[in-house]
Amino acid sequence: MNKIASGGIIRLENGFAAFPEDDPLTVNIKAVKPLKTFFDVAMHGSPTAVGYGTLETNMSPRLLASVIRHMDGWNGQNIRLLSCSTGKQIREEYCFAEELANALGVTVKAPSDTLYISKHGVIYIGELRDGKFIDYHPNQRGRRK
């Protein structure tokens, strides 16, 4: 796990990113301002999984929780997921962010739709900028960890 948590990542002011090497987001993510009391975690995502270092989703919420626990700089803070659609709930299913909140026992703030980051670090959600960040709290719906 320590090898995953230390290899192929970009250190952020308060968090980390894991995008493919040639992805423009490797530059843009560095301009995003940190959010007080939140640890930023950035990579490609979907409502059910994230892509650690790749465009394809390859990591479950529980595996990412384990990576975060081993990451330098994470001291139990809340998480801001800068990963597309990780806060999007499909019907009554649990979304990625909700499962991550359950696994870590902290609040996870995640986008409801596609996340865009400008070269100046400006974030907007949804093609029409009509998305939002949603806060998921641990065991919010009474599910066991």
Place the predicted regions along the sequence by residue:
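Active-site-proximal C-terminal subdomain of hydrolase catalytic domains
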Residues: 79-145
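Glycine-rich short-loop/terminal segments
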Residues: 1-78, 125-145
